[in-house]
Each structure stands twice: as C-alpha cells, then as structure tokens.
C-alpha cells in the first residue's frame, strides 16, 4: 500500500499494488459503494502489476489501537458491531452476494472522528465462487469451513463474533455481564453448527 498525492486535486490517495493475477479484487471492489468502505477512484495496470487507487482513510486499524493498549468501551464495541453488520447486509444482499472472507481488527480502520471503515478486499469472493480455494482467512478469525476451501455469509458472521470477542479483550467477562445480549450474539456467531 502506498500513499500518493493527487497533484490536480491536492488530496491524498491510497494506492494498492497487486500482482496482475490478483486483479479480481479490483473488479469486485469497483462494484462497491458504501459509506463504511473506501471509495475506489481509479485502476491501472503496468507490467505484471495492477494498481487500485482509492480514497485515503486517515486513521488506525483496530489492531493498532489494541497494540497501543487502548481499551474499547462497551458502547464502542456495540457501535463497531452495528457498522460491520450494516456492511455485511450490503455485501450479502447484493446479486450475486459478496462474502468478505477476512474480517479481523487489522482490516478495520477508525478515523479520529470514530468513523469505521472495512478495508482490504483481497479475500472477498462472489457467492458463485464460494468454494474458491484461495480464500482461507486468518487463523483465529476464519470459520472452520474456510480452511476446507468454502465460504458463506455464516463465515463472515463467525469472524464478526471472533473480532468482537477480541475487542472486548481483558474486559470480556465484565462486558458480558454488563451486556448479556453481546455475549449471546458472540456465541451465536461462533457456533460451529451454523458455519
């Protein structure tokens, strides 16, 4: 990922460099328009690489916040969960549906204004490619079936449960007493029978 400056407009853009064989990410990303997803601005190919030029999100990943010792409040965790559910509703209701495939704190960016963005669509697939062998996800967040080479909406929800659990961190037990519905939701997301 590179940071570039648009000389004509005087604004920064993020530029993602990919091997040309991975250009399906650009084709999929080009179709998306949601307030919690970075906007794709342009696409170009050169030699063995393709470049996705997109909106620059100035902020940090949720993983960076965790590494810095930040403790998310229960309200922040519930808000993050709500935003992710809205993005999943948008992706899963498309025709054909899109499965994100790699939800985790390092793929979620938050601006200083607390606006959340889901980034990195490298593992996303259309539902008709649900047995796409390259979509493995990240250990600790990916649903068990992803390691068998299949993915579904339930796989995304499994990763959501694991992500929310990680955001609770050391406060997990007090948070689950404070908001039992959150605990039930996390358990429901991570039940292996649904995946």
Language-model region placement:
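ATP-binding glycine-rich loop module of kinase domains
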Residues: 2-20
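Activation-segment/catalytic-loop signature of the eukaryotic protein kinase fold
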Residues: 43
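Conserved short submotifs of the Hanks-type protein kinase catalytic core
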Residues: 47-61
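AlphaC helix of the protein kinase catalytic domain
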Residues: 62-72
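Activation segment signature within eukaryotic-like protein kinase domains
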Residues: 80-81
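Catalytic-loop of the protein kinase fold
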Residues: 92-110
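Conserved activation segment of eukaryotic-like protein kinases, specifically the C-terminal portion
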Residues: 132-145
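Conserved catalytic-loop aspartate of Hanks-type protein kinases
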Residues: 156
């Amino acid at each position: 990922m590179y940071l570039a400056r648009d000389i004509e407009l005087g604004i920064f853009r993020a530029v993602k460099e990919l091997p040309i064989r991975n250009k399906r990410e650009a084709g999929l990303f080009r179709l998306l328009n949601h307030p919690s997803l970075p906007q794709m601005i342009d696409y170009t190919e050169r030699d063995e690489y393709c470049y996705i030029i997109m909106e620059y999100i100035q902020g940090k990943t949720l993983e960076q916040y965790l590494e810095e010792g930040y403790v998310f409040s229960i309200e922040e965790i519930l808000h993050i969960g709500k935003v992710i559910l809205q993005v999943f509703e948008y992706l899963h209701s498309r025709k054909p549906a899109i499965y994100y495939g790699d939800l985790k704190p390092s793929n979620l960016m938050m601006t200083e204004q607390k606006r959340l963005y889901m980034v990195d669509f490298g593992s996303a697939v259309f539902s008709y490619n649900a047995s796409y062998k390259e979509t493995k996800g990240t250990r600790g967040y990916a649903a068990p079936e992803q390691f068998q080479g299949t993915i579904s909406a339930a796989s995304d929800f499994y990763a959501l449960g694991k992500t929310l659990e990680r955001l609770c961190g050391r406060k997990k037990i007090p948070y689950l007493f404070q908001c039992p519905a959150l605990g039930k939701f996390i358990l429901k997301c991570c039940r292996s029978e649904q995946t």
